[in-house]
């Protein structure tokens, strides 16, 4: 189904791209836009993950450069029966994360330095498990392609405003076309974000909670990231708002309630769903990360059997953060 949705979305974005081309250059502009869109669709399918990671200055790490994070991702990927994804770190103070890649065999998980510094080990595991769930559900292809193509449409629309519309007829249609560009660019980006079903976040929350075995780890992380999104700006995301739907929490602003134009479900609703899941499958009770004991030990065995209700580190949350 993900590939079918991707095809429909690409067709819609191509049509929008052609419309923008027509407004700029008439029939010839639409034809050029069609050719460019076809080439861009092919290029995006194979390269969009690298483009998004580069956009955020993400640096790939391995077991030597980031051993704790790398081993955590490896263990959770094993529990999810996924190939080991590439691991990236973004130098950004806002705690957040996203996954990208056209399929599980070519996937990547990217986390910010803010996420690593501000979350406990347990919360970080919940976030990583959520991103792995997106990979397992093949959401990453749709998220990455829509982000890159929506960004391209916005750039073309901005160029059109500078260019001045269809100069073959400046007596009215050119001006109207320019005004239409002002409306279509943000509207197109909004429609792209709306096209990514918000229900996938609930599905990734549930699957991620089952992967790590502790729904409340993710619930605590969501609350902390949501609060930080109001206080710590993500300037890279502000420059590329079409990528906002890729993150676990909207990096632009917190969403107080579900609404037609939201890129993410309400965090309160997501936490409530995770609380219900915790009551169903078991796991630790909810405690905000600020109450965790800083003197507790770090991770124990990685040989915990798979299954619901048990964490990969022995069942009970440990207070020490993942980075000492």
Curated annotation (Swiss-Prot):
It comes from the Bacteria. Zn(2+) binds at residues 130, 134, 201. Pfam families: Peptidase_M48. Signal peptide: none annotated. CDD domains: M48B_HtpX_like (cd07336). The active site is at 131. GO terms for biological process: proteolysis. One of its GO terms (molecular function) is metalloendopeptidase activity. The chain crosses the membrane at residues 7-24, 29-46, 145-165, 172-192. Residues 288-305 have a biased composition (Polar residues). InterPro entries: HtpX_protease, Pept_M48_protease_HtpX, Peptidase_M48. Its EC number is 3.4.24.-. One of its GO terms (cellular component) is plasma membrane. It is an enzyme of class 3 (hydrolase). It is found in: Cell inner membrane. Its cofactor is Zn(2+). Residues 288-324 are annotated as: Disordered. It is a multi-pass membrane protein. Keywords: Cell inner membrane, Cell membrane, Hydrolase, Membrane, Metal-binding, Metalloprotease, Protease, Transmembrane, Transmembrane helix, Zinc. Its main location: membrane. Belongs to the peptidase M48B family. PANTHER family: PROTEASE HTPX (PTHR43221:SF1). This is Protease HtpX homolog. It comes from Rhodopseudomonas palustris (strain TIE-1). The gene is htpX.
